[in-house]
A protein has these predicted regions:
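Feature marks short, highly hydrophobic, charge-poor N-terminal signal-anchor/signal peptide-like helices
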Residues: 6-18
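Membrane-interface helix termini and inter-helical loops of multi-pass transporters
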Residues: 7-8, 105-113, 160-174, 209, ...
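Loop-to-transmembrane alpha-helix entry segments
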Residues: 10-13, 137-150, 241-244, 268-276
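Alpha-helical multi-pass membrane helix bundles of inner-membrane/thylakoid proteins
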Residues: 39-46, 163-186, 296-307
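Small-residue-rich hydrophobic segments that form or flank transmembrane alpha-helices
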Residues: 44-127, 179-262, 266, 279-282, ...
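Membrane-interface module
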Residues: 265-280, 303, 307
Length: 307
């Protein structure tokens, strides 16, 4: 089983300090933007509905399902936010709950420092350096390929859970060729984030198939988004192209949801974690295949959308 610990390694302390700095930077940028919106007469107090949306979507985000696709669907269904303001609202409102996820999982889930830093760095570099490459690729073809690959991986993991196929291990780190493989794949996943193709489910299945405990994926995938989202969110906040009430609702409802869901994930036995991987992977595969054949695509998460 994964070791949950509050004795922070030096690596974890540095990562947490950087995340706190990013949260402070984003919070200041958002506060300046919100004050300008209030002076312009835009209402700021979120309704109970908006807070409830934030709670539900961030709860499932913390479980690895993702928040942007469900939030987009709810916003459109209930007509809470105009379509043109949805990308900014998501990128602003979900930043601090995502940062909280990263802080919690890096603090309480012990992962080998070399593995954690290498995979965080590779995803981050992939999102920044790979953006110019993958944005020229056909998104529909990538979604189709990723969807089929995830379905195949979920079948293999389902067989493993049914003891019909060798199961993954419970390691908390990688070395040698396995680490190199993980870094390369995570770089590619980071690059694909710029197309709105999620990191969470592929990262969960990658870590599990390489013989690691699935819970080790949570600090990796949450940390990846935690380092990328504040920058994208700050840009949207500065532009003012977001709905203030809805964004505040995502924040207010999202924080307690993250705390509750993180406690559930931390306490899950390995057996149930492996079944969670199957559920998340199948969900992501269906979402990608549906997006590949739908006229409308899921709104990208400023380069960091999990699903």
């Amino acid at each position: 089983r994964a070791r949950n610990t509050m004795t922070l390694s030096p690596t974890a302390q540095v990562l947490l300090a950087l995340l706190v700095l990013l949260a402070t930077f984003f919070g200041w940028r958002w506060w300046v933007s919100a004050q300008a919106k209030r002076r312009a007469g835009e209402p700021a107090r979120p309704s109970l509905l908006r807070a409830a949306i934030g709670f539900v979507t961030n709860f499932f985000d913390t479980l690895g399902i993702g928040s942007f696709a469900p939030t987009t669907a709810i916003f459109r269904l209930l007509r809470v936010v105009p379509d043109e303001l949805i990308p900014g609202t998501l990128n602003v409102g979900h930043v601090l709950p995502t940062l909280l996820q990263a802080l919690i999982f890096i603090a309480v889930i012990h992962v080998d420092p070399v593995t954690l830093v290498a995979m965080l760095a590779s995803a981050t570099c992939g999102a920044w350096l790979g953006a110019g490459i993958v944005t020229r690729l056909p998104k529909r073809a990538i979604q189709t390929g990723m969807g089929i690959a995830l379905l195949a991986a979920s079948i293999l993991f389902l067989l493993a859970n049914l003891e019909l196929f060798p199961a993954g291990g419970d390691a908390l780190g990688l070395s040698g060729g396995l680490l190199v493989c993980a870094v390369i794949v995570n770089f590619a996943l980071g690059a694909l984030m710029t197309l709105g193709i999620g990191l969470y489910a592929p990262c969960l299945i990658l870590v599990s198939m390489l013989g690691m405990n699935p819970i080790a994926a949570f600090p990796i995938m949450m940390g990846s988004c935690g380092f990328l989202m504040p920058v994208a969110g700050s840009r949207f906040a500065a532009s003012g192209r977001y709905d203030l009430r809805a964004a505040l609702g995502l924040l207010i409802g999202g924080i307690p949801a993250v705390l509750l869901a993180a406690f559930i994930v931390k306490q899950l036995p390995l057996f149930w974690l492996r079944w969670l991987v199957v559920i998340v992977t199948v969900y992501a595969a269906v979402l990608m295949l549906r997006g590949a054949f739908a006229e409308r695509t899921v709104v990208p998460r400023g380069g960091t959308e999990p699903l």
